[in-house]
Amino acid sequence: MSANNSPPSAQKSVFPATVSAVLPAPSPCSSPKTGLSARLSNGSFSAPSLTNSRGSVHTVSFLLQIGLTRESVTIEAQELSLSAVKDLVCSIVYQKFPECGFFGMYDKILLFRHDMNSENILQLITSADEIHEGDLVEVVLSALATVEDFQIRPHALYVHSYKAPTFCDYCGEMLWGLVRQGLKCEGCGLNYHKRCAFKIPNNCSGVRKRRLSNVSLPGPGLSVPRPLQPECVPLLSEESHTHQEPSKRIPSWSGRPIWMEKMVMCRVKVPHTFAVHSYGRPTICQYCKRLLKGLFRQGMQCKDCKFNCHKRCASKVPRDCLGEVTFNGEPCSVGTDADMPMDIDSSDVNSDGSRGLDDSEEPSPPEDKMFFLDPTDLDVERDEETVKTISPSTSNNIPLMRVVQSIKHTKRRSSTVVKEGWMVHYTSRDNLRKRHYWRLDSKCLTLFQNESGSKYYKEIPLSEILRVSSPQDFTSISQGSNPHCFEIITDTVVYFVGENNGSSSHNPVLAATGVGLDVAQSWEKAIRQALMPVTPQASVCTSPGQGKDHNLATSISVSNCQVQENVDISSVYQIFADEVLGSGQFGIVYGGKHRKTGRDVAIKVIDKMRFPTKQESQLRNEVAILQNLHHPGIVNLECMFETPERVFVVMEKLHGDMLEMILSSEKSRLPERITKFMVTQILVALRNLHFKNIVHCDLKPENVLLASAEPFPQVKLCDFGFARIIGEKSFRRSVVGTPAYLAPEVLRSKGYNRSLDMWSVGVIVYVSLSGTFPFNEDEDINDQIQNAAFMYPPNPWREISSEAIDLINNLLQVKMRKRYSVDKSLSHPWLQDYQTWLDLREFETRIGERYITHESDDARWEIHAYTHNLEYPKHFIMAPNPDDMEEDP
């Protein structure tokens, strides 16, 4: 055998045992286009199969040996070519050995035929004519394949819809939207923004495709198209293949260009230059993949490559900063738009063309809205792999969920201990100094009998502490005792804490027992910070030399149109930092408690530093509207506090929201009876708003709060950050609200009026009764509304009355002039129901206030009950609400 036909010594097995990279097998665009894979994909070729049958006149059967695995294949004789066999090899590797594939494998594999009669058993195949029936063909990797080839592994991306909050694995920012939020790699399962797809490194691990090499493949399983080179295939269109199963989607090969990949690998790896950074959007640490939590300065960001991580993770990040890598003349670094300030524009116009008075436009893109996620929300399943196909009997609409714009946060299971240790104290009632093991958390100060037991002597809720002051009252001290170090003042008793032994030097032994000025001062500082965990303490700045700092912490309380200066919110309310109730347009809502009365409240904390100075008036929009609203169906505003950095809006605290009630129901939807009861209350509250020319603009189940956990609860509207003052014949054009509940005129940037809220009511009725959103984003809203088969599929709409569907149809009218008003909706037969009226009257009697029904209807319903032999209760309260009579039109 000649040297040319012998396998070179440098050749190596195509599947070494130590290969760890997992990679698909793309090949260059210059490879033959008549390969086997194309024919396999359209069915004109029989797929290779494991068979023992003998070849016929029209087929050639032979064995392919790849490493330690043999595959029996059959190919049509007229289609047998060297390129076809190589295509077949690539397909087998792609499915059975993804960890051994690499970029451009097609051009770097050699085929050898086993010839047992030759001294050199392996004979290099240079033509398909050398392959005969029953031959054993060995696949060998060429010496031209380098380590670099194995390191370049492109991702196979397809458009994907996520059912849970998901973050981009490249830049760390959230994937926004309701559907088709980003791209998922079919090989490794990582998720990316579309804008990041051209920047990601070609490092697919292929873990989702990895298959045991000793498992035989079925015949049809090998009919996989050979993908083109990354430079030759554009990204998959968002409009196509979105709702196909992953196995049926055609992946798009994307990532950095190969020339850039080679350039990056040759660069010298340098350490990152980290600096503390504040993020305006939810971002995860790119090292530990956990959320960067907080209001500001949440983490560290590399100044050069924009890598994001926790402060604790910065020291663990590899020294692999790429610097300012450019692509098409633009930086490839991540997070460039996360640093941009929120751009707020003003473009409201009334019907007469005049400018709106306090109507600066909200940030137009929904992505600019700030919100924070609780880590427990990220533990759920990140996505689903399949989507139900459209059929007349099942709905293809999006299941009802808490949209990303208004994530529902849950309270943590346990408070974090802020400080613990031994401390001494006596009180204004008992001057005997006692020693206990103090433990301070975010809600209370507990005095334990010892450091390990669960028995405690006293528990002091932080909400009962009126203030912490320096030592002033020494009248209660026993004779001969050392003075105390600071005082904790509550409504009923004063705690004199610490013992000043007069020593100027630190004594560790005494400090461990709670004696000494330094240990007491550390406790004083910790308690002051715990009293107001979300803002600097005004009470800390007490010395005359700190006048400037004191002014910075001065607050103003606005309550019942009265202005009180130098009022610190921490002296009136206790804010629980670990009890996050939710997030609104401009801030986060925390649970809180009034110190003197113990009343539970909800406190929205707004960070003014995130917005331009000229837009500060917009931050007060919600407060300005709520101050003039006094209605049982609208959340009550107690007061507002303001510092130069923050605004604190104090409101009544309610039990939960309507969305939570819907999702927790047995079928994830509400019965008609309860829906009627709640929708009537919503419409009555809207009637009060519209009478005052106020349009909510962001009505959705998340903003309908429940006062209790009863089956028929009182509901109240909240979150007026988007609300607008719109006259009866006026229009606005500013971008407002949540897209899933918005009317078409807002989504199309056309003028809208108060009928905007009525469209939202229609969506609320729909999602309450069905548990799904009414529209699929893939189709035009007009077409979907006119197609009753898809708008109201039998499951579940066969169980729902035709009157409910009729009301929904009259509310979901694309033309605003045809859309029902509040009064027309309340007069609709679906809501004019005797049982609904009884439920509402029972509720009004229970709370002792009549504001939903009207006394003029009593006679009509009494006649109705008499006519139909129904019971008419006599215990209902009869007096209407005087305020309701004055305000209603």
Swiss-Prot record:
Q: Where is this region: Disordered?
A: 336-370
Gene Ontology cellular component list: cytoplasm; membrane
Per the UniProt record, one Pfam family is PH
Q: Which residues hold ATP?
A: L581, G582, S583, G584, Q585, F586, G587, I588, V589, K604
Per UniProt, the Phorbol-ester/DAG-type Zn-finger stretches lie at: 154-204, 271-321
Task: Using the record's annotation, list all stretches that form the PH domain.
Answer: 416-532
Where Phosphothreonine occurs, the residues are T535
Task: State the active site.
Answer: D698 (proton acceptor)
Disulfide partners: none
- Give residue numbers for the modification (Phosphoserine): S27, S37, S41, S44, S213, S216, S346, S391, S395, S442, S539, S730, S734
How its function is modulated: the record gives: Activated by DAG and phorbol esters. Phorbol-ester/DAG-type domains 1 and 2 bind both DAG and phorbol ester with high affinity and mediate translocation to the cell membrane. Autophosphorylation of Ser-734 and phosphorylation of Ser-730 by PKC relieves auto-inhibition by the PH domain.
The answer to whether keyword Magnesium applies is yes
Is DNA-binding set as a keyword in this record? no
Q: What is its EC number?
A: 2.7.11.13
Q: Which reaction does it catalyse?
A: L-seryl-[protein] + ATP = O-phospho-L-seryl-[protein] + ADP + H(+); L-threonyl-[protein] + ATP = O-phospho-L-threonyl-[protein] + ADP + H(+)
One MF term in the entry's GO annotations: protein serine kinase activity
Q: Which UniProt keywords apply?
A: ATP-binding, Cytoplasm, Kinase, Magnesium, Membrane, Metal-binding, Nucleotide-binding, Phosphoprotein, Repeat, Serine/threonine-protein kinase, Transferase, Zinc, Zinc-finger
Q: Where in the cell is it found?
A: Cytoplasm; Membrane
Taxonomic superkingdom: Eukaryota
Report the cofactors.
Mg(2+)
**Start and end of every Protein kinase domain?**
575-831
- Which parts of the sequence carry Phosphotyrosine? Y426, Y457, Y741
Provide the function of this protein: Converts transient diacylglycerol (DAG) signals into prolonged physiological effects, downstream of PKC. Involved in resistance to oxidative stress.
Q: Which family does it belong to?
A: Belongs to the protein kinase superfamily. CAMK Ser/Thr protein kinase family. PKD subfamily.
Q: What is this protein called?
A: Serine/threonine-protein kinase D3
What is the native source organism of this protein?
A: Mus musculus (Mouse)
Question: Which gene is annotated as encoding this protein in its UniProt record?
Answer: Prkd3
